[in-house]
Amino acid sequence: YAVASSEESVDSAAKLGAHQVMFADRPWEMRAPVIEHGRDLHRKYHGTEPPCVMLTEFCVCGTDLPTLEEEARQYQGKFVESNFYHYEFLGEHFAAVKGYDSYQQKAAIMRESGVEGAVDGFMQAASWGTPDKILRGLEDRRKLLGDFELNISFRFGGTPFDVSERGLKLFAKEVLPVLQSW
């Protein structure tokens, strides 16, 4: 497994024959061309079909959609905000760092839209909501990207333990069995 966002890291993952690991940090329509490019590179280097991409994300799951949207905005938002400042996305420094073109793309989007816009983009990509809403989103993602592995976290951005536990248990009960049937 290799995190693969930039052109260089996608190429490295393909050369290694590794599963590309992609984070749910922007709409999947923006990610699809990079994922497909990595698959093409794998075929070129190895003459075989590439392994499934692993999608890594942060999930809020429950039964009351308005409450879940508030929780997702709060906790996924806190995670995005911490990344926003940790990576100093308001700066221009990624443009000069080889291998960080995807960060530069993210930085440009964040400079234009601010933290709120970054949170909106993150929430378009990440799983949050009722089990049915989450499943519909994952089905749409599968149609766009093909089969994938899923690495999902329920505790992030200050999420209280009870909210994390609620989401994990409900996801395991109602979402996971459907995913395992794919």
Regions found by a protein language model. Give the residues of each.
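Long, low-complexity C-terminal extensions of enzymes
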Residues: 130-171
